[in-house]
């Protein structure tokens, strides 16, 4: 079974559940783990971007966790995780800096991502679009780290 939560960057660089997701009060404890990890890594990415963060028009983080259950159990144990980053920026020259900030957040700075890596593999996909409509230029990168 796959559990998933999506967050979007809002005013004040706050990460909130994306449209269609319930607020935090409606999340199960296991979904709260995904929410907390997405919010923590998002905060680290914004901090690492510095002045470039102002040129990021939107940042959506989707965190998925594969849950393994045994028998008739209602809850299970996470076995692996996938983070998906959908970024729209105003300047195509910022693509490499954005990718690097995501790499650093996953590989070095985010304590919650490091915690998830103790549970199982953590992979991430990066989709970066530039232009006002988000359709000019597109990069995809998939990284799996343990």
Residue ranges and their predicted role:
Residues 1-36, 43-146:
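Extended beta-strand/beta-hairpin segments
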């Amino acid at each position: 079974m796959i559990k998933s939560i999506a967050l979007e960057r809002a005013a004040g660089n706050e990460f909130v559940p994306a449209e269609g997701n319930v607020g935090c009060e409606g999340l199960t404890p296991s979904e709260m783990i995904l929410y907390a990890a997405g919010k923590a890594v998002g905060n680290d990415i914004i901090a690492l971007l510095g002045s470039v963060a102002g040129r990021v028009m939107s940042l959506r983080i989707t965190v998925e966790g594969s849950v393994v259950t045994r028998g008739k159990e209602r809850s299970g144990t996470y076995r692996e995780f996938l983070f998906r980053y959908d970024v729209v920026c105003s300047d195509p020259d910022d693509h490499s800096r954005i990718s690097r900030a995501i790499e650093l957040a996953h590989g070095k700075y985010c304590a919650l991502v490091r915690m998830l890596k103790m549970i199982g593999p953590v992979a991430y996909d990066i989709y970066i679009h530039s232009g006002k409509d988000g359709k000019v230029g597109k990069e995809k990168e998939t990284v799996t780290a343990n």
